[in-house]
Amino acid sequence: MAPKRSSDLFSQVVNSGPGSFLARQLGVPQPETLRRYRAGEPPLTGSLLIGGAGRVVEPLRAALEKDYDLVGNNLGGRWADSFGGLVFDATGITEPAGLKGLHEFFTPVLRNLGRCGRVVVVGGTPEAAASTNERIAQRALEGFTRSLGKELRRGATTALVYLSPDAKPAATGLESTMRFLLSAKSAYVDGQVFSVGADDSTPPADWEKPLDGKVAIVTGAARGIGATIAEVFARDGAHVVAIDVESAAENLAETASKVGGTALWLDVTADDAVDKISEHLRDHHGGKADILVNNAGITRDKLLANMDDARWDAVLAVNLLAPLRLTEGLVGNGSIGEGGRVIGLSSIAGIAGNRGQTNYATTKAGMIGITQALAPGLAAKGITINAVAPGFIETQMTAAIPLATREVGRRLNSLLQGGQPVDVAEAIAYFASPASNAVTGNVIRVCGQAMIGA
């Protein structure tokens, strides 16, 4: 799916010829046009350097050598290459003094990181460290990657991946996460921390079609982010069951037709919602679905002192109670079983809060609660659950924000711009992949490393 053109007038102006010149003269930060996924294009625009002395250097090289231009590590050399990605394996750092390795690896090569480059640090889960000093050193990696993300320019991003120390030497569960981060699919994911468990993974037959043959339920699919999720899922090979309320029937039918899926008119807050979805699955898909995306959501903004019961209750019902009921119901009746994927839509408002949105922020923080509370029990059934928390995304809702507020909101992140619905959809598709079976309980922001929140 081709990326949509940005509706951000400021970015269009300062990236134009005359506008770019004027912006440089005035010292105005210039948002980079982010490189997003296009079928057939290489994952990175330059070579990939993998360094460090940890346990995943060689497994990563073996997993990625077919699709990436790998180069060797030469810490003392001068580089003529423009790197597309830099990966540092920090799993071998067991003492705080060993953090010097970060400086030694990155400092000589950072200036050679190309436009929209990727920086990924792989560490070990701090809570599972073998010693106090190792735990301290591994926890320190988060401050490094978040700070580096705020230093990089030209659309480059950082990420930290914590790998379970119980992962087998081949670390196959790490591959899907690394492929996502080292690609244009993660264009608006910056400064985030991913946790990968010990489970092994089997790569898909085709990394371009990782969802081939899967059945995906997407609520709130008539328009906006939900419709884009459906498009990305279909691109990746899934059959989409697109769900929305009957008042959105025309848009829902358009979405379903566009992606070759099926439309189901349904109020997710209805008492019989689980039964109707299960019936649809029995009639069309042998009673089973592989993926559930709890995307449906509404806003009813008001200062709490002025908020009536109707506004509070409606947001709670759609955004929090319905996702919990659907998840527990569809897992409980076997519609989603072993190998299943559940992904919830949280929001940066649920992390940082937002004035006038106590109801909305409560539900989006609650979505994080659903993810973290259900993850252990679902893992025992072979099901993963993760959440995506979008920041400022260019949608009809954000387009209605007053101009001055909208422009400020767009700039308050390391990438100096708003994201696109496809950025959210790509993160959800990564979580939905069968190869992401070692990834559960994560809450990942798609926010360009927003300055607010954690």
Curated annotation (Swiss-Prot):
Keywords: Fatty acid metabolism, Lipid metabolism, NAD, Oxidoreductase. Changing R146A: 2.2-fold decrease in catalytic efficiency with NADH as substrate. 26-fold decrease in catalytic efficiency. The keyword Transmembrane helix does not apply. Disulfide bonds: none annotated. Its EC number is 1.1.1.212. Substrate binds at K302, L303, L304, A305, N306, N354. Gene3D superfamilies: NAD(P)-binding Rossmann-like Domain. Pathway: Lipid metabolism; fatty acid metabolism. One of its GO terms (biological process) is fatty acid metabolic process. GO terms for molecular function: 3-oxoacyl-[acyl-carrier-protein] reductase (NADH) activity; oxidoreductase activity, acting on the CH-OH group of donors, NAD or NADP as acceptor. Changing R445A: 12-fold decrease in catalytic efficiency with NADH as substrate. 26-fold decrease in catalytic efficiency. InterPro entries: NAD(P)-bd_dom_sf, Sc_DH/Rdtase_CS, SDR_fam. NAD(+) binds at R223, G224, I225, D244, D267, V268, N295, A296, G297, Y360, K364, T395. Transmembrane segments: none annotated. The active site is at Y360. It catalyses: a (3R)-hydroxyacyl-[ACP] + NAD(+) = a 3-oxoacyl-[ACP] + NADH + H(+); 3-hydroxybutanoyl-CoA + NAD(+) = acetoacetyl-CoA + NADH + H(+); (3R)-hydroxyhexanoyl-CoA + NAD(+) = 3-oxohexanoyl-CoA + NADH + H(+); (3R)-3-hydroxydecanoyl-CoA + NAD(+) = 3-oxodecanoyl-CoA + NADH + H(+). Belongs to the short-chain dehydrogenases/reductases (SDR) family. Restores respiratory growth of S.cerevisiae oar1 deletion mutant. Homodimer. Contains an N-terminal flavodoxin-type domain and a C-terminal ketoreductase domain. The C-terminal residues participate in intercatalytic domain interaction and play a pivotal role in stabilization of loop I, which is responsible for interaction with phosphopentethine moiety-linked fatty acyl substrates of CoA or ACP. Catalyzes the NADH-dependent reduction of beta-ketoacyl derivatives. Can accept the beta-oxo fatty acyl group covalently linked with CoA or ACP for catalysis. Highly specific for NADH. Could be involved in fatty acid biosynthesis. This is 3-oxoacyl-[acyl-carrier-protein] reductase [NADH]. It comes from Mycobacterium tuberculosis (strain ATCC 25618 / H37Rv). The gene is fabG4.
